[in-house]
Amino acid sequence: MALRFPRFSQGLAQDPTTRRIWFGIATAHDFESHDDITEERLYQNIFASHFGQLAIIFLWTSGNLFHVAWQGNFETWIQDPLHVRPIAHAIWDPHFGQPAVEAFTRGGALGPVNIAYSGVYQWWYTIGLRTNEDLYTGALFLLFLSALSLIGGWLHLQPKWKPRVSWFKNAESRLNHHLSGLFGVSSLAWTGHLVHVAIPASRGEYVRWNNFLNVLPHPQGLGPLFTGQWNLYAQNPDSSSHLFGTSQGSGTAILTLLGGFHPQTQSLWLTDMAHHHLAIAILFLIAGHMYRTNFGIGHSIKDLLEAHIPPGGRLGRGHKGLYDTINNSIHFQLGLALASLGVITSLVAQHMYSLPAYAFIAQDFTTQAALYTHHQYIAGFIMTGAFAHGAIFFIRDYNPEQNEDNVLARMLDHKEAIISQLSWASLFLGFHTLGLYVHNDVMLAFGTSEKQILIEPIFAQWIQSAHGKTSYGFDVLLSSTNGPAFNAGRSIWLPGWLNAINENSNSLFLTIGPGDFLVHHAIALGLHTTTLILVKGALDARGSKLMPDKKDFGYSFPCDGPGRGGTCDISAWDAFYLAVFWMLNTIGWVTFYWHWKHITLWQGNVSQFNESSTYLMGWLRDYLWLNSSQLINGYNPFGMNSLSVWAWMFLFGHLVWATGFMFLISWRGYWQELIETLAWAHERTPLANLIRWKDKPVALSIVQARLVGLAHFSVGYIFTYAAFLIASTSGKFG
């Protein structure tokens, strides 16, 4: 008999219904559940798949470079980054009529093109790329790396090259190599690139393989390094009149602490960034030599953890048992990695707009909006994933005997206190925030806007003032002009930083008021509720008050009637499913807030945000409705324009989103009956009944339908907002 899909589970392959296909797809990556899996093969499969992941990433980035070099306008854009629109790639579409061809022929192109809102042009320009040839070279190099990764993945599945389990579990060695290799050496290499290529390029000097050995990055070469006169590298920085990419107003410094932004590009000083990466490199190179491996020197992580017994016995046996628990659980490790990566991705979103690193990106408003939104959504998905794998850890890998009375066991012991604490915090935030918004709504509806409850965020304003923002008049710490810290700041550290905070041309420490106070608490509500659902899902994964015997029912049991008190929505899977809706909801509020506040800043009508953001009707009317006018106008009696594609995507996003509800709000029995009816009709229809199928069609399980519904809801939600964001921003600012 020919092997049927899925080959990794012969039990499932025997299933006579369409469940075989769906469950096969669902468990394809759950290596732990596959037939004949051993711990060694599990680790080797995951290791090999990492190489495949890298190959895909390199191929994708190579494609970006290649298409811009082939179909973009990089060399033209460099001549005038503020007015030429960067082209991502050409569009070839046989359906385009003349109006469409005209609408999408932009940026000096000969035919229809897509505009780039990813910031790659600004990034490549900042790091020293200047010609299409540079882009092609980069694309080829990344293609080579992609091939190398694929070969590496294949190689590490061959018998002679398969790593052993002991190698995967050597935590100290892995930590040393990741700290000093991934972070240390790569940061050092990046410093080298910035100093040898990017900084000279910003001063009009073109350094490539043919001349990089005879162009000194600094007039004094390595002299100051070896004589200990490191401060020489910071002397004579670029002046405030420096024209980026030319020698006009440029200096010779390579490692500085200027602070603030380059006046022309509105981005951080390249010499500050080189200095930053050098410091990071040194820190991580030291950190990467701290853990004990072959030589018996350095820290043992197990010893470190076991020494962590808090005084007074308030946390029981502290971190005892954690080393083996974490080191033997891939899900725990993945949970930690995802939690860290999620936080970092959100921080990237926050810092890319407030401290722009790439030349001229701050003046490309649509790109700023797109990058912020993109990174916040990615962060949301990654963070929810962290808790999902935390829940799987408790089900598959947690051993109560091994963790007796340590910090992990104590989390489980008082989980009810944790869950109820999050619960009352969420309820408090929700009712009070909504109460304020609704009160203000009613006051405006009755024409008595002066009766709104408007709360000044004085604590946040005080914190901003302490960091140097003077406009609130608090006169405290760095905003106090006669304080020692302020005066030291003028000369010793980051002299440009305080100026940047008080300039109104950037997004540092934006002025905040009652509207910000309210939306801040709405976002806090979203964050706490999402966290509540996720934490409860993980802590109750093996058993809860309602159903103490969960661990015998696997990871994703369906709704099981009222027998054990009803098991709907109480599996770890269900918690994840519900949390994703709240995550999307929260990030919706975050991105609405960011976008509206910035649109009014960029347009110079900040009072619109300040006055309309204190009541819900203001958000609905003056943000959502007002800014969707371009989308509703994508197609009109006068033909089409360059926003038509976003108008279409806006509609299509709503369609996908609405389709999600067909799976989310329905009864499984209804679908089963519908399927049976269709199958019956098919089998009795001449000609049609010549087509047969082997698998008996059955309705999706409850968990499957929820997944399909959630996927449509998420994709539709993001498509809709992406179209809204890009069209409303590019429609205003070009």
UniProtKB/Swiss-Prot annotation:
Cofactor note: P700 is a chlorophyll a/chlorophyll a' dimer, A0 is one or more chlorophyll a, A1 is one or both phylloquinones and FX is a shared 4Fe-4S iron-sulfur center.
EC number, as in UniProt: 1.97.1.12
List of residues binding chlorophyll a B1: H654
One of the record's GO cellular component terms: photosystem I
Binding positions (phylloquinone): W671
An example molecular function term from Gene Ontology annotations: electron transfer activity
InterPro entries: PSI_PsaA/B, PSI_PsaA/B_CS, PSI_PsaA/B_sf, PSI_PsaB
Membrane topology: Multi-pass membrane protein
Cellular compartment(s): Plastid, Chloroplast thylakoid membrane
Gene Ontology BP term (one): photosynthesis
SUPFAM superfamilies xref list: Photosystem I subunits PsaA/PsaB
Catalytic activity: reduced [plastocyanin] + hnu + oxidized [2Fe-2S]-[ferredoxin] = oxidized [plastocyanin] + reduced [2Fe-2S]-[ferredoxin]
Domain of life: Eukaryota
Listed PROSITE patterns: PHOTOSYSTEM_I_PSAAB
Positions of transmembrane segments: 46-69, 135-158, 175-199, 273-291, 330-353, 369-395, 417-439, 517-535, 575-596, 643-665, 707-727
Binding site for [4Fe-4S] cluster: C559, C568
Pfam families referenced in this protein's UniProt entry, alphabetically: PsaA_PsaB
Binding site for chlorophyll a B3: M662, Y670
EC category: oxidoreductase
Protein keywords: 4Fe-4S, Chlorophyll, Chloroplast, Chromophore, Electron transport, Iron, Iron-sulfur, Magnesium, Membrane, Metal-binding, Oxidoreductase, Photosynthesis, Photosystem I, Plastid, Thylakoid, Transmembrane, Transmembrane helix, Transport
Similarity field: Belongs to the PsaA/PsaB family.
NCBIfam families (alphabetical): psaB
Function comment: PsaA and PsaB bind P700, the primary electron donor of photosystem I (PSI), as well as the electron acceptors A0, A1 and FX. PSI is a plastocyanin-ferredoxin oxidoreductase, converting photonic excitation into a charge separation, which transfers an electron from the donor P700 chlorophyll pair to the spectroscopically characterized acceptors A0, A1, FX, FA and FB in turn. Oxidized P700 is reduced on the lumenal side of the thylakoid membrane by plastocyanin.
Subunit structure comment from the entry: The PsaA/B heterodimer binds the P700 chlorophyll special pair and subsequent electron acceptors. PSI consists of a core antenna complex that captures photons, and an electron transfer chain that converts photonic excitation into a charge separation. The eukaryotic PSI reaction center is composed of at least 11 subunits.
Protein name, UniProt field: Photosystem I P700 chlorophyll a apoprotein A2
Originating organism: Draba nemorosa
